[in-house]
Amino acid sequence: MSRRGTAEEKTAKSDPIYRNRLVNMLVNRILKHGKKSLAYQIIYQAVKKMQQKTETNPLSVLRQAIRGVTPDIAVKARRVGGSTHQVPIEIGSTQGKALAIRWLLGASRKRPGRNMAFKLSSELVDAAKGSGDAIRKKEETHRMAEANRAFAHFR
């Protein structure tokens, strides 16, 4: 039996202005080269732009966007008898949120536009409405899992 203790699960901290964990998760994912103040600046500008576009609470739009993009199921490569199968697996809520944030940021980086705050706000508003690149990525993942449903017993 191992003598190592189990690591305590870290709880996500809240951001200083909105006191929201999702905003903090977004900040930590957009972070590049340790420039956290710039990451906060981009996120807060994006939230302001979302407020102007939708004229509703921007945090509810953010929650709705992340809920819309969060996948329930994904595929994982599993090697069985010399061939690799894409095995569908269920995703937990924390991992799903992390994937959703990664997809939203990736989709907003690919968008044409002036700056990251503008692109991110546009992607979040689109995702909340049920369109956009991140939603397409989620649907693609679900289709892939559905197509490989026959391999679910390899789990």
Curated annotation (Swiss-Prot):
Quaternary structure, from the entry: Part of the 30S ribosomal subunit.
BP GO annotations: translation
PROSITE patterns named in the record: RIBOSOMAL_S7
Keywords for the protein's UniProt record, in alphabetical order: Chloroplast, Plastid, Ribonucleoprotein, Ribosomal protein, RNA-binding, rRNA-binding
Annotated protein name in UniProt: Small ribosomal subunit protein uS7c
Homology family: Belongs to the universal ribosomal protein uS7 family.
Entries under HAMAP family matching the protein: Ribosomal_uS7_B
Cellular component, GO, one term: chloroplast
Highest taxon of the lineage: Eukaryota
Subcellular location: Plastid, Chloroplast
Entry GO MF terms: rRNA binding; structural constituent of ribosome
Gene3D superfamilies: Ribosomal protein S7 domain
Function per UniProt: One of the primary rRNA binding proteins, it binds directly to 16S rRNA where it nucleates assembly of the head domain of the 30S subunit.
Gene: rps7
SUPFAM superfamilies documented for this protein: Ribosomal protein S7 (SSF47973)
